[in-house]
Design a protein with these regions (language model features):
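Glycine-rich, proline-tolerant flexible connector loops at the mouths of alpha/beta enzymes
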Residues: 27, 34-54
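Conserved, mostly hydrophobic/aromatic
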Residues: 18, 42, 90, 104, ...
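Active-site glycine- and acidic-residue-rich loops that bind
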Residues: 94, 144-158
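Short, well-ordered coil/turn segments that N-cap beta-strands
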Residues: 11-16, 36-37, 63-67, 87-88, ...
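Single conserved hydrophobic/aromatic residue that forms the stacking wall/gate
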Residues: 160-170
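Active-site-adjacent beta->alpha loops and helix N-cap segments on the catalytic face
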Residues: 3, 45-59, 74-78, 96-111, ...
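Catalytic cores of alpha/beta
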Residues: 76-88, 99-100, 154-159
Length: 170
């Protein structure tokens, strides 16, 4: 399975999503089977911890809805467990500089393009990848969304924008 959310974005299609900040697998399952293209799992402003996030991502399996998680900051420590759980996109808050934008990309990508460690234990099931090489390549399909929320980000916008098909600015 590729990333249907990414495919629709790349085609310029409108993608309908829904946000949840409640740590509920039942809610994640209901929402992901309600016709949405993506499920916004909010770990920054909600009560969702990594265990709940993993279970919520698992609850989206079997649907065409891509789980996309807003992490607390653009770091490997917050991003790696979310991706290892099977997230198909990551929303990074407070991207204010070229450095924070680069840190976000590095947290998603495997070496040599990034700094993400290899942990192919759960996510390949969500991505339906049985081959390790195929799963490694699937990191290129992860949608990276940078939130522009601060005046410093506006002032640095030309530096923040990295021309890469998996990046989006909001």
């Amino acid at each position: 399975m590729s990333n249907p959310f990414r495919e629709r974005l790349d085609k310029g299609q409108v993608c309908a999503g829904v946000l949840t900040s409640m740590p509920s697998t039942n809610m994640a399952q209901m929402l992901s089977n309600s016709g949405f293209d993506w499920l916004f799992i909010d770990m920054e402003h909600g009560a969702i911890d990594i265990a709940s996030c993993y279970n919520m991502i698992t609850a989206t399996s079997g649907s065409a809805c891509s789980p996309v998680v807003r992490v607390m900051e653009p770091s490997i420590a917050f991003t790696k467990p979310v991706l290892d759980s099977g997230a198909m996109g990551v929303i990074f808050p407070m991207i204010t500089s070229k450095e924070t934008a680069e840190a976000a990309v590095a947290a998603v990508k495997y070496p040599p393009a990034g700094k993400r460690g290899w942990g192919p234990f759960y996510a390949p099931m969500r991505w339906q990848k049985k081959d390790s090489i195929e799963y490694y390549k699937s990191s290129d399909d992860i949608v990276i969304i940078s939130l522009i929320e601060h005046i410093d980000a506006i002032n640095n916008l030309s530096l923040i924008h990295i021309s890469e098909p998996t990046r989006r600015l909001v």
